[in-house]
Design a protein with these regions (language model features):
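Fe-S ferredoxin-like electron-transfer domains
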Residues: 1-124, 130, 136-149
Length: 149
């Protein structure tokens, strides 16, 4: 059996999939902490995706109830639902902090068992941040607070 992975049809399917992912992403790459190291940005550039032909599926002002005092920050508008954070937390760290919430187009990655992140047993190991391909999970930036001190 021969499987062709670089035919025009396969390349077009890849491009369409990336465009669909980008339609649910906030696409503010210039101001993102992952700019230059974002895997979605790299794949988009490699495939030549310069604009998204689909209407953005982000709800205006979509926010999550996330504390700004916790060292881990989550941006649901940058999350592409790859579930790497869930896998690394479950299989490597054995903490099960993250879980899938909702279904269909409302699917999101959230703290398991409908807990707040402060109530979860997160060890702050940073593995979920390291494995996040976009800026969906990142460490809290206290640069301005340090300069103000």
């Amino acid at each position: 059996m021969v499987i062709h992975t670089n035919t025009p049809r396969v390349r077009e399917a890849r491009r369409t999939n990336v465009e669909l992912i980008l339609s649910q992403h906030d696409n503010k790459c210039a101001t993102c902490v992952r700019s230059g190291s974002c895997q979605l940005q790299k794949i988009s550039n490699d495939l030549g995706v310069l604009s998204v032909p689909y209407k953005s599926d982000l709800a205006a002002g979509k926010k999550s109830f996330w504390t700004t005092t916790f060292p881990l920050y989550r941006d649901i508008n940058k999350c592409i639902k790859c579930m790497r954070c869930i896998q690394i937390c479950d299989k490597v760290q054995s903490l099960s902090i993250w879980d899938v919430s909702g279904s269909g187009s409302r699917t999101t990655i959230d703290v398991s068992e409908n807990r707040f992140i402060k109530e979860a047993d997160c060890s702050l190991c940073g593995q979920c941040i390291t494995h996040c391909p976009t800026g969906g999970l990142r460490e809290r930036d206290d640069t301005q607070r340090a300069f103000a001190a």
